[in-house]
């Protein structure tokens, strides 16, 4: 009887967890998904073009997603699962990047596939958010902050492996 009750309680906990009820915006053929509607149309079109050209040039896929609600989830976990759901990056190389912004919750994250982690480390991603994106957001320029963040990420993933490793190692922790 105890095992039946324990099994039922565990099953209920799994069903009731935020991950089980997770809904993601749809990736509809362009690398920018602005569900939170914070990027003006002209800037969104320019970002889409830039990100498609970056993918063509490097083979690495970078997407920008804005969401109005994380549904109670941690942003890093949400970004990771969003990348898996959308199948960002090459399946074999695991080299995708998700730049996720949840403006209503004042959260940002850069989720990096394992294949790009030596190039775009957690420390460097944190520096990009802290030193490049956040100042623009605080000044009320969210589209500018997103653009500058994309530029910093794109610059890093276009470096040679040696240059990228040197820059990543120099990022303050």
Segment roles from a protein language model:
Residues 21-173:
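Folded, non-transmembrane soluble domains that reside on the lumenal/extracytoplasmic side of membranes
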